[in-house]
């Protein structure tokens, strides 16, 4: 009997340890420092940081529904209400959004950039990969609509987790959201993405690790992995979506975007970049990326004339 109790105790201890460790890795994923991001972006030819410091911009702070502040910048040099909101990826911050900011500014659009919860200057204790972030994005969109007096077009560009956030937001705000979306390298389902990363990084099976981690994720973070699923809401999105992914992405497979594109009804476009790893489609394919985005934006402008 004593051996049985010891075995049960050891099993319970192991389950708790697994749950705490893996849920901690998800909720408190290590973030890049400003120095890391600046070095990476500069090494990749994005010399945008000094110009941002000198650029005229308006800082903003808005309260999240979850009790922290969301911080960002509105950059509006053009005489137009048309604006792109840029959502950065996990572990990043607004510094990673600057290359996209310059792309859209060059194309004649104003830009709003901000830090997701637990990233950059924004508050928040945990990362939820789009689950809570989509509601913060709703606050940002409302701020922008008030700034522009509900005039002009609003588009949302997201990279990686930012793309997931944009799609989850779009699925929840079909009639009162943005006018269009650009989703660059999103995952289709978070539980599938976690299973994929477990195999790729640790050579570990998803069972029983993921069910245990998922229980603790709900306990500690308030959400389950299956609740973070663009694929589950993509058929609700009526507004146009441009999907982007590099074919050689080995962090989030290109098949994720292909599945989302296939299931999306209504206006949509797909650009599979020839070069670049995860979240590097613009960096490694600047001309074709810009051309694809410009054509998509031109279609948005034409549809409102």
UniProtKB/Swiss-Prot annotation:
Gene3D superfamilies: alpha/beta hydrolase. Pfam families: Hydrolase_4. The keyword Oxidoreductase does not apply. It is a single-pass membrane protein. Keywords: Membrane, Transmembrane, Transmembrane helix. Its main location: membrane. It is found in: Membrane. The chain crosses the membrane at residues 8-28. GO terms for cellular component: membrane. PANTHER family: ALPHA/BETA-HYDROLASE (PTHR43358), EXPORTED PROTEIN (PTHR43358:SF5). This is Uncharacterized protein YqkD. It comes from Bacillus subtilis (strain 168). The gene is yqkD.
């Amino acid at each position: 009997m004593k051996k049985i109790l010891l075995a049960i105790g050891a099993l319970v201890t192991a389950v708790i340890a697994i749950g705490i460790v893996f849920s901690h890795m998800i909720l408190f994923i290590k973030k890049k420092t400003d120095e890391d991001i600046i070095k990476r972006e500069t090494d990749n030819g994005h010399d945008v940081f000094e110009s941002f410091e000198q650029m005229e911009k308006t800082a903003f702070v808005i309260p999240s529904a979850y009790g922290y502040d969301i911080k960002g910048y509105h950059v509006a040099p053009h005489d137009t209400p048309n604006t792109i909101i840029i959502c950065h990826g996990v572990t990043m911050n607004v510094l990673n959004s600057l290359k996209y900011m310059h792309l859209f500014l060059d194309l004649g659009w104003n830009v709003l950039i901000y830090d997701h919860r637990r990233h950059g200057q924004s508050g928040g204790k945990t990362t939820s990969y789009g689950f809570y972030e989509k509601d913060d994005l709703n606050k940002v969109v409302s701020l922008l609509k008030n700034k522009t007096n509900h005039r002009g077009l609003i588009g949302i560009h997201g990279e990686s987790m930012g793309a997931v956030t944009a799609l989850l937001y779009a699925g929840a705000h079909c009639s009162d959201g943005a006018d269009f979306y650009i989703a660059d390298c999103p995952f289709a389902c978070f539980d599938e993405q976690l299973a994929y990363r477990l195999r790729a990084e640790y050579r570990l099976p998803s069972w029983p690790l993921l069910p245990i981690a998922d229980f603790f994720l709900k306990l500690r973070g308030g959400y389950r992995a299956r609740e973070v699923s663009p694929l589950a809401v993509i058929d609700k999105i009526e507004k146009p979506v441009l999907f982007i992914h590099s074919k050689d992405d080995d962090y989030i497979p290109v098949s994720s975007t292909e599945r989302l594109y296939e299931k999306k009804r209504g206006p949509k476009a797909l650009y599979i970049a020839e070069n670049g790893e995860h979240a590097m489609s613009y960096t490694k394919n600047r001309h074709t990326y810009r051309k694809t985005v410009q054509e998509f934006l031109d279609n948005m402008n034409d549809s409102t004339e």
